[in-house]
Amino acid sequence: MPVSAKLVTKYGSKKLLTIAAPLYVIALTNLGLAGSSWHLALSLFFFGVIGNMANIAVNTQGVDTEKLYDRPINTSFHGAWSIAGFAGALVGLLMINLHIQPYQHFMVIMLLSWINVFFNHQHLVSGQEDKDTKRPFFIKPEGSLLQLGIIAFCSMAAEGAMFDWSGVYFKDVVLAPQSLVVLGYASFMVMMAAGRFIGDKVILKAGRKRTMQASGIIISAGMAISVLFPNIVAATIGFMLVGLGVSTNIPSVYSVAGRNEKIPPGIALAMVSSVSYLGFLMGPPLIGYISALSNLRYSYALIGCFGLLITVLVTRSKAIN
């Protein structure tokens, strides 16, 4: 994260994204060529490093573009990411059914990505390069940025619970038939994507603070319904609410962090992302640990409390308005 932030602020997100995006798909293709565990481990390492650079750069682009439009649009960009996830899954399914090898699949994606970057990099926002050459390499997040990071941490923990444990929850707690085990995850993803495409209009009408306050309550309500009524219909509705609740949080946090007046957007986004991704990494193992001591319903109840914490933190935040 600090390296990505330094590169974005020194050279600008446009330059970094134009370089990182083609390298990202090269790293992806290298995964398909891995012939040993060491090769795979190194490939995954570079895939993560370059992917993080692209992530910070593209989110900085989103923040800078939103500033130019002077209205909420960043949530829709994240909606496009959600749609790309669905598209990637469908393409992967098609490739499997056609018996195409992973490296061939990845090479097709690499070619399409290169074409995309070649024709569209000129439309990226130039942004501003950081002129402060004495800025320290690592800046500890504090104050409003730390608060934003904790809000994002809670939201990412809820996302991680859905990504990694929704299938297990539907199988072991809801006791859904095998054909419906993926229903919870699918309903969550659909509502998260839908929420992101309508989120900007909601933020414009209701305000960012009220929208984020409501999102925390919606996350908690969704988790509560899933825990208290562990049947297929209620759990599906609950997971849909969680998807709707988390849909606007991360884009909103990035937008607010990128508008701070003390440090460049790239560094601010890296700070917030460093804290938030801990939620994505720590949330699922925490759920597994608690469920091993008791059961998965208690784990989901705890994640539901994170939603209320989001509402409290947003209410107390002076940076969010």
Name each model feature, range by range:
Residues 1-12, 96, 195-207, 291:
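Helix-to-loop junctions at the C-terminal end of transmembrane segments
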Residues 1-38:
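Conserved MFS/SLC helix-loop-helix module at the cytosolic interface between two early adjacent transmembrane helices
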Residues 15-29, 210-225:
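Structural signature of the two symmetry-related core transmembrane helices
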Residues 32-43, 228-237:
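Helix-loop junctions at membrane interfaces in 12-TM secondary transporters
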Residues 45-46, 142-158, 240-244:
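Pair of pore-lining "gating" transmembrane helices in MFS-fold secondary transporters
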Residues 53-67, 248-261:
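Intracellular juxtamembrane helix-capping segments at the cytosolic ends
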Residues 76-125:
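Helix-loop-helix hairpin linking two adjacent transmembrane segments in secondary transporters
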Residues 164-180:
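Short amphipathic helix-loop junctions that connect adjacent transmembrane helices
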